[in-house]
UniProtKB/Swiss-Prot annotation:
UDP-N-acetyl-alpha-D-glucosamine binds at T15, G16, G17, N127, R165, S191, I247, A266, L267, T268, V269, S270, E271, Q292. It catalyses: di-trans,octa-cis-undecaprenyl diphospho-N-acetyl-alpha-D-muramoyl-L-alanyl-D-glutamyl-meso-2,6-diaminopimeloyl-D-alanyl-D-alanine + UDP-N-acetyl-alpha-D-glucosamine = di-trans,octa-cis-undecaprenyl diphospho-[N-acetyl-alpha-D-glucosaminyl-(1->4)]-N-acetyl-alpha-D-muramoyl-L-alanyl-D-glutamyl-meso-2,6-diaminopimeloyl-D-alanyl-D-alanine + UDP + H(+). It comes from Shewanella baltica (strain OS155 / ATCC BAA-1091). This is UDP-N-acetylglucosamine--N-acetylmuramyl-(pentapeptide) pyrophosphoryl-undecaprenol N-acetylglucosamine transferase. Its EC number is 2.4.1.227. The lineage of its organism: Bacteria, Pseudomonadati, Pseudomonadota, Gammaproteobacteria, Alteromonadales. It is found in: Cell inner membrane. The gene is murG. Belongs to the glycosyltransferase 28 family. MurG subfamily. GO terms for biological process: carbohydrate metabolic process; cell division; cell wall organization; lipid glycosylation; peptidoglycan biosynthetic process; regulation of cell shape.
């Protein structure tokens, strides 16, 4: 097994789609005796989340430049140089055996600093279309990994899936319970909620409930609880609906659900596959390069999900898809199995194995 005392610098931040897969790898390597340190930014979610998992984190000063104003773009090169120097200082002090970049602003300067120091750089891209940072770093990385086929077209990349929590992998292996009479719909719109779900679901459930028992667990996002609850009440549907700003225990939510209505973020798609749940995917229309549509195609092509572009989504289309699933529980179960069939369940171990191999060669 891995010799104790090896060191890895993990770079991931900004969103849960970057941070949680990186945490899965970090936890795995820490259990093997590795010393883990994190590189991130002080104003994003990693600053709060990473220390909760027991890992030390260093911060550099860097922000995105895509879509920003002229002055910020002109100043960007100077800020990038400064952030590379900050990352070099962290690397010089920590002396990692390998550096793992999994997306977010800090990965760019940190990746450049790692290669300048002669340290192996492993990249992992979670989305079907690479972000700007990983696209640039892929040219200098020692090893490029990705979750989906054909993500990178100009460099060789190994497809390993997305690292996810072991609890969800175990959940997907559990026998599925007998279906209740009521269709159980889990609605997840991210930490801020999804306005389109909050607007359409109350009326869609009212339409559906005329012919079918349905219960809903709806995560509405910050500050949306009162308004969405009132909308369900207005449509006479407050009895069978559990409304929450956040769902802290996604394992429990996935275990409860028959079908999930959600966006098509990379981590969400990978989790749906791992737990074996059918889904209705509505990609976030403003995602960079429309990468969520590409993410969702993996489940759609497997026959495990429906994909509805937000531009054409309305109450009747949403109610119709839910009715279709409610009326054919056999097909619903098949969709769940197809989702599980395309899951990559050892992504964490594969990413860790690459890091271990490069560290040992060094």
């Amino acid at each position: 097994m891995t010799p104790a005392g090896k060191r890895i610098l993990v770079m991931a931040g900004g969103t849960g789609g970057h941070v949680f897969p990186a945490l899965a790898v970090a936890k795995y390597l820490a259990q093997q005796g590795w010393q883990v340190r994190w590189l991130g930014t002080a104003d994003r979610m990693e600053a709060r989340l990473v220390p909760q998992y027991g890992f030390d984190i260093d911060f550099i000063d860097i922000k995105g430049v895509r879509g920003n104003g002229l002055i910020r773009k002109l100043a960007a090169p100077f800020k990038v140089v400064r952030s590379i120097l900050q990352a070099k200082a962290v690397i010089a002090e920590f002396k990692p055996d390998v550096v793992l970049g999994m997306g977010g602003f800090a990965s760019g300067p940190g990746g450049v600093a790692a290669r300048l120091a002669g340290i192996p750089l492993v990249l992992h891209e979670q989305n079907a279309i690479p972000g700007m940072t990983n696209k640039l770093l892929s040219r200098i990385a020692t090893q490029v990994l990705c979750a989906f086929k054909n993500t990178f077209t100009t460099v060789k990349a190994k497809v390993v899936g997305n690292p996810i929590r072991q609890e969800l992998i175990a959940l997907g292996a559990e026998p599925k319970p007998e279906a209740d009479e009521a269709l159980k719909v889990l609605v997840v719109g991210g930490s801020l909620g999804a306005k389109v779900f909050n607007d359409l679901m109350p009326e869609a459930v009212a339409i559906l409930s005329q012919q079918q028992f349905v219960t809903v667990w709806h995560q509405v996002g910050k500050d949306n609880l009162t308004g969405v609850k009132a909308a369900y009440q207005q449509h006479g549907q407050d009895g069978g609906v559990n409304i929450a700003e956040f769902i802290d225990d996604m394992e429990a939510a996935y275990r409860w659900a028959d079908v999930v209505l959600c966006r098509a973020g990379a981590l969400t798609v990978s989790e749906l596959a791992a737990v074996g749940l059918p889904s209705i995917l509505v990609p976030y229309p403003h995602a960079v390069d429309d990468h969520q549509t590409r993410n969702g195609q993996v489940l759609v092509e497997a026959g495990a999900a429906f994909l509805l572009p937000q531009a054409i989504l309305d109450v009747n289309k949403l109610a119709g898809k839910l009715q279709l699933l409610a009326n054919d529980r056999t097909e619903l179960a098949r969709m769940g199995q197809r989702a599980r069939d395309v899951a990559v369940l050892d992504a964490t171990e594969q990413v860790a194995a690459v890091c271990i191999s490069l560290a040992e060669k060094g």
